[in-house]
């Protein structure tokens, strides 16, 4: 608590560049000026770091980061609980994490993208939540966003068939209310 999301961004950039000897892949991508996305509470994804935005007890924060090393992209998104959070917030974060693992456990050659989405959707909705449909996982490799699009909802046996060597993200976004989101400026 107390640190600004911009200070976190700056520390992460320093670590990527000076310790990992890598390139922050999101900086400059789609004119994005920062190294990471910091999405707080009801912001589902793509939140921008701000000097005026300080972490406080009770917040849930998603940090999404990509970096490039030796021509390959790595992408990671993780939720953090700041201090004491409400039981509802804690449960939402826990069930989202568990839903991600439900999707990961389905991954194997011969499975389909629909199998992954169905595993996530079934778990999420079975716990009284909804899956955001406007955003999805994606392939990663030499570019930050590659095919395939990995939907976090779906019908078993549909979509692309998984093959050995495919690299993609599974990063479900889950809402406590309805699935719809609105884009903020």
What role is predicted for each listed range?
Residues 1-185:
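Active-site neighborhoods and metal-handling regions in enzymes and metal-associated proteins
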